[in-house]
Regions:
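ATP-dependent adenylate-handling ligase core
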Residues: 2-7, 55-162
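Phosphate/oxyanion-binding active-site loops and adjacent basic polyanion-contact surfaces
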Residues: 7-15, 35-42, 69-73
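A generic local structural motif
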Residues: 17, 36, 149-153
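Single conserved hydrophobic/aromatic residue that forms the stacking wall/gate
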Residues: 165-173
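Active-site-adjacent "lid"/gating segments
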Residues: 1-29
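A phosphate-binding catalytic loop at a beta-strand-loop-alpha-helix junction
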Residues: 22-55
Length: 173
Protein backbone atom coordinates (compact mmCIF):
# COMPACT_ATOMS: atom_id res chain seq x y z
CA UNK A 1 0.00 0.00 0.00
CA UNK A 2 1.24 3.47 -0.75
CA UNK A 3 0.82 6.39 1.62
CA UNK A 4 -1.30 9.27 0.28
CA UNK A 5 -1.47 11.93 2.96
CA UNK A 6 -3.22 10.20 5.83
CA UNK A 7 -4.88 7.66 3.53
CA UNK A 8 -3.55 4.29 2.52
CA UNK A 9 -4.44 3.16 -0.99
CA UNK A 10 -4.08 -0.11 -2.80
CA UNK A 11 -2.48 -0.28 -6.24
CA UNK A 12 -5.92 -0.93 -7.71
CA UNK A 13 -7.38 2.19 -6.07
CA UNK A 14 -4.52 4.28 -7.41
CA UNK A 15 -5.07 2.83 -10.90
CA UNK A 16 -8.76 3.76 -10.73
CA UNK A 17 -7.81 7.31 -9.75
CA UNK A 18 -5.43 7.50 -12.70
CA UNK A 19 -8.06 6.14 -15.09
CA UNK A 20 -10.59 8.65 -13.79
CA UNK A 21 -8.15 11.45 -14.53
CA UNK A 22 -7.28 10.12 -17.98
CA UNK A 23 -10.86 9.57 -19.10
CA UNK A 24 -11.86 12.97 -17.69
CA UNK A 25 -9.02 14.92 -19.30
CA UNK A 26 -8.71 13.27 -22.72
CA UNK A 27 -11.31 12.78 -25.42
CA UNK A 28 -9.24 10.23 -27.33
CA UNK A 29 -7.47 7.51 -25.39
CA UNK A 30 -5.82 4.51 -26.97
CA UNK A 31 -3.92 1.62 -25.45
CA UNK A 32 -0.93 -0.12 -26.97
CA UNK A 33 -1.80 -3.82 -26.79
CA UNK A 34 0.79 -6.45 -27.71
CA UNK A 35 -1.15 -9.42 -26.43
CA UNK A 36 1.27 -9.87 -23.54
CA UNK A 37 0.39 -9.95 -19.84
CA UNK A 38 1.19 -6.32 -19.01
CA UNK A 39 -0.63 -4.73 -21.92
CA UNK A 40 -3.49 -7.21 -21.47
CA UNK A 41 -3.97 -6.12 -17.87
CA UNK A 42 -3.83 -2.46 -18.87
CA UNK A 43 -6.36 -2.92 -21.67
CA UNK A 44 -8.73 -4.88 -19.44
CA UNK A 45 -8.49 -2.26 -16.69
CA UNK A 46 -9.50 0.41 -19.22
CA UNK A 47 -12.33 -1.71 -20.64
CA UNK A 48 -13.63 -2.50 -17.15
CA UNK A 49 -13.42 1.17 -16.14
CA UNK A 50 -15.45 2.26 -19.19
CA UNK A 51 -18.08 -0.43 -18.61
CA UNK A 52 -18.37 -0.05 -14.82
CA UNK A 53 -18.67 3.73 -15.07
CA UNK A 54 -21.06 3.49 -18.04
CA UNK A 55 -18.98 5.94 -20.04
CA UNK A 56 -20.43 6.80 -23.42
CA UNK A 57 -17.13 6.56 -25.25
CA UNK A 58 -14.86 4.30 -27.19
CA UNK A 59 -11.30 3.20 -26.50
CA UNK A 60 -8.66 2.99 -29.20
CA UNK A 61 -6.43 -0.09 -29.32
CA UNK A 62 -3.09 -0.01 -31.14
CA UNK A 63 -1.90 -3.52 -31.96
CA UNK A 64 1.11 -4.27 -34.12
CA UNK A 65 0.57 -7.68 -35.66
CA UNK A 66 4.05 -9.03 -36.40
CA UNK A 67 2.69 -11.98 -38.43
CA UNK A 68 5.06 -14.44 -36.75
CA UNK A 69 4.03 -14.73 -33.12
CA UNK A 70 2.73 -17.41 -30.82
CA UNK A 71 -0.54 -18.85 -32.08
CA UNK A 72 -2.07 -18.58 -28.61
CA UNK A 73 -1.14 -14.87 -28.48
CA UNK A 74 -2.95 -14.30 -31.77
CA UNK A 75 -6.01 -16.18 -30.50
CA UNK A 76 -5.99 -14.16 -27.26
CA UNK A 77 -5.73 -10.86 -29.16
CA UNK A 78 -8.57 -11.91 -31.48
CA UNK A 79 -10.74 -12.95 -28.52
CA UNK A 80 -10.21 -9.74 -26.53
CA UNK A 81 -10.78 -7.46 -29.51
CA UNK A 82 -13.90 -9.33 -30.70
CA UNK A 83 -15.52 -9.58 -27.27
CA UNK A 84 -15.19 -5.84 -26.73
CA UNK A 85 -15.84 -4.58 -30.25
CA UNK A 86 -18.79 -2.54 -29.00
CA UNK A 87 -16.43 -0.08 -27.29
CA UNK A 88 -13.11 -0.53 -29.12
CA UNK A 89 -11.68 1.26 -32.14
CA UNK A 90 -9.01 -1.20 -33.23
CA UNK A 91 -5.89 -0.21 -35.12
CA UNK A 92 -4.49 -3.62 -36.01
CA UNK A 93 -1.31 -2.87 -37.90
CA UNK A 94 -0.02 -5.29 -40.57
CA UNK A 95 2.74 -3.25 -42.18
CA UNK A 96 6.06 -4.46 -43.66
CA UNK A 97 8.29 -2.11 -41.68
CA UNK A 98 11.77 -3.19 -40.68
CA UNK A 99 11.99 -5.28 -37.51
CA UNK A 100 15.29 -6.10 -35.83
CA UNK A 101 16.20 -9.78 -35.93
CA UNK A 102 18.95 -11.91 -34.48
CA UNK A 103 17.76 -15.07 -36.21
CA UNK A 104 19.93 -14.56 -39.30
CA UNK A 105 23.65 -14.25 -39.87
CA UNK A 106 22.95 -12.40 -43.14
CA UNK A 107 20.21 -9.91 -42.28
CA UNK A 108 19.83 -7.52 -39.36
CA UNK A 109 16.11 -7.02 -40.00
CA UNK A 110 13.08 -8.72 -41.49
CA UNK A 111 9.68 -7.46 -42.64
CA UNK A 112 6.37 -8.90 -41.46
CA UNK A 113 3.67 -9.01 -44.13
CA UNK A 114 6.12 -8.29 -46.95
CA UNK A 115 4.16 -8.74 -50.19
CA UNK A 116 7.05 -10.35 -52.08
CA UNK A 117 7.30 -13.02 -49.36
CA UNK A 118 3.59 -13.87 -49.33
CA UNK A 119 4.12 -17.57 -50.18
CA UNK A 120 6.15 -17.82 -46.96
CA UNK A 121 3.72 -15.98 -44.69
CA UNK A 122 2.89 -17.92 -41.54
CA UNK A 123 -0.79 -16.95 -41.85
CA UNK A 124 -3.05 -14.62 -43.77
CA UNK A 125 -3.59 -11.03 -42.68
CA UNK A 126 -6.53 -10.62 -40.31
CA UNK A 127 -9.68 -8.95 -41.58
CA UNK A 128 -9.98 -5.19 -41.21
CA UNK A 129 -6.31 -4.66 -40.52
CA UNK A 130 -4.45 -1.50 -41.46
CA UNK A 131 -1.81 -1.93 -44.18
CA UNK A 132 0.94 0.29 -45.55
CA UNK A 133 -1.54 1.81 -48.03
CA UNK A 134 -3.48 3.30 -45.12
CA UNK A 135 -0.57 5.46 -44.00
CA UNK A 136 0.70 8.35 -46.11
CA UNK A 137 3.89 8.42 -44.03
CA UNK A 138 4.94 4.84 -44.78
CA UNK A 139 8.28 4.30 -46.53
CA UNK A 140 10.36 1.17 -47.04
CA UNK A 141 13.04 2.64 -44.75
CA UNK A 142 10.71 2.76 -41.74
CA UNK A 143 11.51 0.68 -38.64
CA UNK A 144 8.75 -0.60 -36.36
CA UNK A 145 9.64 1.79 -33.51
CA UNK A 146 9.62 4.75 -35.94
CA UNK A 147 6.23 3.62 -37.20
CA UNK A 148 4.83 3.79 -33.65
CA UNK A 149 5.84 7.45 -33.34
CA UNK A 150 4.51 8.35 -36.77
CA UNK A 151 1.28 6.48 -36.05
CA UNK A 152 0.72 8.63 -32.96
CA UNK A 153 1.22 11.77 -35.07
CA UNK A 154 -1.12 10.37 -37.76
CA UNK A 155 -3.81 9.60 -35.19
CA UNK A 156 -3.40 13.02 -33.60
CA UNK A 157 -4.08 14.69 -36.96
CA UNK A 158 -7.26 12.63 -37.35
CA UNK A 159 -8.56 12.83 -33.77
CA UNK A 160 -7.03 15.98 -32.23
CA UNK A 161 -5.66 15.50 -28.70
CA UNK A 162 -4.87 11.87 -27.90
CA UNK A 163 -3.32 9.94 -25.06
CA UNK A 164 -1.41 6.74 -25.70
CA UNK A 165 -1.43 4.52 -22.63
CA UNK A 166 1.28 1.89 -22.65
CA UNK A 167 2.48 -0.82 -20.37
CA UNK A 168 6.20 -1.41 -20.73
CA UNK A 169 7.48 -4.47 -18.92
CA UNK A 170 11.03 -3.24 -19.53
CA UNK A 171 10.28 -0.27 -17.27
CA UNK A 172 9.23 -2.46 -14.34
CA UNK A 173 11.64 -2.10 -11.45
Amino acid sequence: MRQMGNLRSSVYEVVLERLNRIFSDFDNVYVSFSGGKDSGVLLNLCIDYIRQNKLNRRLGVFHIDYEVQYEETTRYVDRVLASNSDILDVYRICVPFKVTTCASMYQNYWRPWEDSMRPLWVREKPENCYTKEDFDFYTDDLWDYEFQIKFAEWLHKRNAACLLYTSDAADDK
